[in-house]
Each structure stands twice: as structure tokens, then as C-alpha cells.
Amino acid sequence: NSTDAAALVRPGCALDREAARRGTSVYLPEETLPMLPPELSERRLSLLAGQDRPAVSVFVSLADDGSVRRCSLQLSTIRVTRRLSYQDVDAQINSGGVFQRLHAVLMRSRETRLAAGASGISIPELQVRLSRDRRVVLSVRERETPAQALVAECMILANHSAALFLRDNGVPALYRTQKPGSLRAAHRRADLPLAERVRLRHAFNRTIVETRPRVHAGLGLDCYCSITSPLRKYLDLVMQRQLTAALQARGPVYSCEQLRDIAGALQPVLTRAALVENERRRYWLFKTMEPLRGQVMPALVLSRRKKHYTVLLRDYLLEASADPPDDGAYEPGRDVQVLLRSIDPFEGVISLSIV
């Protein structure tokens, strides 16, 4: 289920215009800048326990092998009886019951996508946030938990189901597409060495938003769109409007040309939002590392260039250039020690050398 934001945020209203201007919620270490006002995103439209909420529901019947037997999409009213944390669901998956069975079936569905060419590469992620007393808190997510994997597969399944519905009913839509790359199956495994996984991350073709339903190679699906985050992504809100109109047997809210115009206008907005997120995350990370100037830290060689190496600082999962040592040469995957010569949080500049 995803909350039916389209029921309250009408096309062209003041809320819609502001949401289009923002394009997305922006997540910074120090704060979140929501696309929609908190009164809506955190209260009136949030799936709070014990409250009736309009929703778009995707009903899917899965076989034991993870294949889809039946699927339907409906407008609904739902009431959450109990909100579960990821930790709650992890515990229930480990102890048996419905969540364990659901997780097992969804992991077979994931295996089917992987066999169709989806990427299984997972890279540790450094999370940077500020505590209430303005301390920088760093944490590393090594890999997704069973609960996170379950939720991810549910979202992919819901979005794929919506894309199939829109495509098969001839409804104008914005699809997320990705051309197949040149990676061999051996390069899509999750158990590759870290240096290889980081290097291959840059080898995938970029995802494109377009009105033609084409393959999304990175997910191993024949078509894909995104409808599950209408409170924080404007394109999801737009697509939810198209979907709800079709479910109500009304004409489409947007034509293909209008959708292309919306996607084109939104692209620089989303690019700028991603840049701000990356710059603020980098700033606070560099503030944490600033007292370490002149110290040596572990790194992993990713690649070698004519005049420098690209390394990954292991403790911070940060890719950066490093000057070569006075003698010797290192191949990708080699563990080395690097000297932090200088770092400037305001300019976002770091200087390293292999020692």
C-alpha cells in the first residue's frame, strides 16, 4: 500500500506548484527538507496506526518460486493496526511465521530478477547525521538486513505491477529505463571483492525517465515506473495521479507530451537536490576528519592512473585521489596506508598520499 497523496494534492493547486518546485524531499545530515508540508507528509497522509487513510493498494499472489500468479491494483482505505520497525520484522523473520514465509518467497523473486540480468552488487554505505546536540554521528551499513530486503522487494514488485498495468492499458506514463550493460554474470555477484564492486558501480548505464516502456536492466525487469513515494518524490505523485485516474475509469491527467515536459523541467531540480545532499554530507564528514590531518589511515586501491591512484578510505568509505609512493606500484584491491596531508570542509578538498 502507498498513501493516496493524489486524493488531496490536486494538479495546479498551490501545494502542487510548490511540490513541483521542490521536486523531492532533501535529506541532509542536519535536517530534512520535505517536499510536502509536515502537516500532510507526517500527519494527514502518513500511515499512522489506528487512522483511516486513502491508499493505492497492489494485491499480488505469489507462487512458491516467487513468480506472480495474480495481480490487481485498487483504490482503498486502509487502517494500520500496528507499526513495525525493521528490527521488529527482522526478529519475526528469524522466529518463523508469516514474515519468514514472505521473505523466503520474495528472495526467490529476487533470484528470478538476478537471473534476468539484475545487479546483485551491494556496497557498504556510510551514513552521516547530526545528533540533537550537533555532534556528527557516523555509521556504516554493511549490507541490508532481511527486513530491508523484504521491503525493497515489495516496493519493486509494486512499482513493476503499476508499470505493467499502465503499459497494458495504454495509459501515458513515465517509465524508468536502463539499457543493458556489458557486465558478465560473474560481475553481478554480491560476493565480489569490495574494490571490484566499487569499480563496477561506475560501469552501469544511467537510468533514464521516458514515456516508452522499455527494459530496466539493473532491476532485471521488462518495464518499471515509480509510484510508491508520492509524499517525497514529485514524479511519483504525478504517476500516482495517472494510475488513480485509470483505476477510476477516467481519462489520463497528463498526455505523453505533458509528462515529457514535467520530467524535463524536473531534471535540473533533482540534480541540484542530489548535489546539495552530497555536498552537505561531504562537509560534515570532512569536519569529522579535520582533526586527523597529518595522520595515516587504511585505504584500498581502486584504480591506477598515470599520476595518481584512486583509493577508498576504509573507515569512511570515501573515494579520493592519492599521490603515488616514492617507489613501487600497487594493483587494484591492494590494502595500503595513506597520509591525510590536508583537508578543507568548506571547499570539499582532500589531499592524500600513499606511504
Model-derived features: positions:
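Short, compositionally biased
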Residues: L352-V355
